[in-house]
A protein has these predicted regions:
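A short glycine/serine-rich beta->alpha loop
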Residues: 15-16, 33-42, 70-79, 133-145, ...
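Non-catalytic terminal/interface segments that mediate subunit docking, oligomerization
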Residues: 21, 339-483, 561-573, 579-589, ...
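A short, small-residue-rich loop immediately preceding and capping a beta-strand
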Residues: 37, 73-74, 137-141, 170-188, ...
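Thiamine diphosphate
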Residues: 111, 117-140, 156, 160-174, ...
Length: 700
């Protein structure tokens, strides 16, 4: 919260009656849609309509005919509950739809019928904006703070793309990133993480617009929020501008111009507003925030606007044409000029032009995996993080837009790109491929989303235990179906002496529970190779790659099944004679080798044993039933799972009568070997569990 409340003198538009009519159309469509849905948030659209109108109509470089034009300005509605403001703008400006293959369609992204069915099944106007569902929505928002943090990733992408592809006479990437946010975003910790990093990097193409309306759901912000936001952001190093009244479009224009001329830091525009502007009984109250105004209040508000009181979903004559002649005409001219410039660029820099086109289509360069190593059998082996480092560097040098970093843990997660020319991304070296997120796991994950939404292939790394800090942003990546790569190391009690605070237990099942997220825990170096190959080929799925700190034996693939089995999620690694097992041992990661050692001994005893490596449950569940039954035959009831994590979820595969060797409490601080003995991760314990399962199955 900052500054004084605005006056209630109403609109002070400079352009004329059509501008007020356009602004009030945004307001009334929002009010009517929320009322029709019997749920939603009318107050912020009513307050911020002049702000969004001024930005879109006069400043935003955006062509409604092509909402995925690469050099468009990005607009992020971080306070996603105000979604009707964005939907109304998408409709009135005539934004066209784009399909999942990034093909432009002729139909409107948002029709008036969609607005009338706000928050209803299959309407393009969902309760909160959803990327890929509604064209023109740059990122899914709703959880407060996520949008502004994601916008930092977009601004980093803009800076990197400009540095990578800009050449004398060809400035191809100079887009701005705007994010509209409120008190809720400012209170969420992720916004602080992201704002701090944005200032450090000098992201001058980034503008946050702060709706300072003094109201939250419970009442006035004074109940829980009294900091000076302007001072806080000046402390970060931002340029801070103020607009005393959200209805003053002239002041708004001056603020946006002030952002544009700022070249060394991001900008925060603090806009004082009235939530529920014009509502005679609910303006400036929490009642205007998250519920319909009511029919009578809407009539009175429309009277205040000079609007037909009983008209619903009214778009007056001339409003659509006004937007078409403003943002529509300007955006089309800018896009056409950019397209012509790109064709000239292609003639001079054909290889770079090809890169840009592949990047935009999420395609890969020819021969991108030609340098990927294979690893010989080795009883000592490599830690998952070490083999991953080799594979990642081999791939990244051939995929120029693959970049990333860690939350101050690259020496431990082994994710630093070390080939010639990789470099660090900093304010003074914006073409670097190594990002330094600092100790900001949540912001890192949200920033990765912004990078991916800008068509880069980002990766971020940290310890698996701290994936909890990033979970909100990981979940949004899955909802959006964007190919973000999360590399989580130190994956188990193998962390050893660091103790239970750093030993992940419940994190693996937690990540597996996120729909659409692939969680992969490779068994050895060659499964790591296959994991990276598969990950890079993905276009619409985020991944959590789970890697060990301790060494894992490199399995002899001349004796056991090929690591390419990872692609089906689970595969038979070692089998009984004639492929007819009496007991199945299944595991992920470092515990696969433990099962192989038990297989050797049990086989020598004459037991018919199968070992199944299960690096990715999600991929396995997608396989045809015949494939799944071929790996885990239904008639084999004797089953044992082994994983240094919570046993939660394993009953799906071992059955209610099966055995799961895993963690049922938190770990302890001790050397790894002692912990393995303590918690039963030994060859002898696996063998005993197998024998007990066989005995149980024979009695069944």
């Amino acid at each position: 919260m900052t500054g004084a409340k605005p006056t209630t003198t109403g609109l002070t538009l400079e352009e004329g009656p059509i501008d007020r009519k356009a602004i009030d159309t945004l307001r009334t469509l929002s009010m009517d849609a929320v009322q029709a849905a019997s749920s939603g948030h009318p107050g912020t659209p009513m307050a911020m309509a002049p702000v969004v109108y001024t930005l879109w109509q006069h400043f935003l470089r955006f062509d409604p005919e092509d909402p995925i034009w690469p050099n468009r300005d990005r607009f992020v509605l971080s306070m996603g509950h105000a979604s009707m403001l964005l939907y109304s703008m998408l409709h009135l400006t005539g934004v066209k739809a784009v399909d999942a293959r990034y093909e432009r369609l002729g139909e409107l992204s948002v029709t008036l019928g969609d607005i009338e069915r706000f928050r209803q099944l299959d309407s393009k106007c969902a309760g909160h904006p959803e990327y890929r569902w509604t064209s023109g929505v740059e990122t899914t928002t709703g959880p407060l703070g996520q949008g502004v943090a994601t916008s930092v990733g977009m601004a980093i992408a803009a800076r990197w793309q400009a540095a990578r592809y800009g050449r004398p006479g060809f400035e191809l990437f100079d887009y701005d990133v705007y994010a509209l946010c409120g008190d809720g975003c400012m209170m969420e910790g992720v916004s602080s993480e992201a704002a701090s990093l944005a200032a450090h990097l000098g992201l001058s193409k980034l503008c946050w617009i702060y709706d300072d309306n003094h109201i939250t759901i419970e009442g006035p912000t004074s109940l829980a929020f009294s900091e000076d936001v302007s001072a806080r952001f000046r402390g970060y190093g931002w340029n801070v501008l103020h607009v005393a009244d959200a209805n003053d479009t002239g002041a708004l224009a001056r603020a946006f111009n002030g952002f544009r001329v700022t070249k060394d830091r991001p900008t925060l525009i603090v806009v004082a507003s009235h939530i529920g502007f014009g509502a005679p009984h609910k303006q400036d109250t929490s009642a205007a925030h998250g519920e319909p105004l009511g029919e009578e209040e809407i009539r009175l508000t429309k009277r205040q606007y000079g609007w037909p009181e009983d008209a619903k979903f009214l778009v007056p004559t001339g409003v659509r044409e006004h937007f078409r002649d403003g943002i529509g005409r300007r955006g089309k001219a800018l896009r056409n000029a950019w397209s012509a410039r790109f064709e000239e660029y292609r003639k001079v820099h054909p290889d770079l032009a090809d890169e840009i086109e592949r990047m935009q289509k999420r395609a890969l360069p020819e021969g991108w995996d030609r340098d990927v190593p294979t690893f010989p059998a080795d009883a000592k082996g490599l830690a998952g993080r070490d083999s991953s480092a080799k594979v990642l560097n081999a791939i990244a040098k051939n995929v120029p837009w693959l970049l990333g970093g860690s939350a101050d843990l690259a020496p431990s997660t082994k994710t630093r790109l070390v080939f010639d020319g990789a470099g660090d991304f900093e304010a003074s070296t914006p073409s670097g491929r190594n990002l330094h997120f600092g100790i900001r796991e949540h912001a890192m994950a949200a920033i990765l989303n912004g990078l991916a939404l800008s068509k880069l292939r980002p990766f971020g790394s940290g310890f698996l235990i701290f994936s909890d800090y990033a979970r909100g942003a990981i979940r949004l990546a899955a909802i959006m179906e964007i190919p973000v790569i999360h590399v989580f190391t130190h994956d188990s009690i193998g962390v050893g002496e660091d103790g239970p605070t750093h030993q992940p237990i419940e994190q693996l099942p937690g990540l597996r529970s996120i729909p659409g997220l692939l969680t992969i825990r490779p068994a050895d170096a060659n499964e790591v190779v296959e994991a990276w190959r598969m990950i890079l080929a993905l276009r619409h799925e985020p991944v959590a790659l789970i890697l060990s700190r301790q060494a894992c034996p490199t399995i002899d693939r001349t004796r056991f099944a090929a690591a390419s089995g990872l692609r089906q999620g689970a595969y038979v690694l070692a089998d009984a004679k004639l492929g007819k097992p009496d007991v199945i041992l299944m595991a992920t990661g470092s515990e696969v080798s433990l099962c192989l050692a038990a297989w050797e001994k049990l086989t020598a005893e004459g037991v018919a044993v199968r070992v199944v490596s299960m690096p990715c449950w999600e991929l396995f569940e997608r396989q045809p039933e015949a494939v799944r039954d071929g790996v885990l035959p239904a008639h084999v009831l004797a089953r044992v799972s082994v994983e240094q994590a919570s046993v939660f979820g394993w009953e799906r595969y071992v059955g209610l009568g099966g055995a799961s060797i895993g963690m049922r409490n938190f770990g302890a601080s001790a050397p790894l070997q002692e912990l393995q003995q303590l918690f039963g991760f030994t060859v002898e314990n696996v063998m005993d569990a197998a024998r007990q399962q066989l005995a149980r199955a024979r009695k069944a």
